């Protein structure tokens, strides 16, 4: 579109406490969520894949560590870890459980680093916030061969 060059393509927080952007062309008035068509779609025609609201995903949250993903951490760090017998497994309590769900994508209240699709956070599945939503999806409608 004409006039879109150099403008932000997602609704996110720019700096400390700056929810709407700066004065002039970069002010998107995105104090909270914006309409779905406020920004251009991605190459697949999907809107707001980053920014506006975080999206719940189906995954149960599990933190990644070097034992799970050895190729991401090629240095063997077991010499620097506490031994397992030093932990009290009887009274172990964690925020991470089978009820912890992943959300990602960044929201209007998050900084730019959360807009990356690789960033993950978690929240109890029965919780809600003003910055988390979900995306409705369906199979393609119409007949095959009509450009869909």
Task: For the regions a language model picked out, list residue spans one by one.
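Short, acidic, Ser/Thr-enriched surface-loop or helix-capping motifs
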Residues: 48
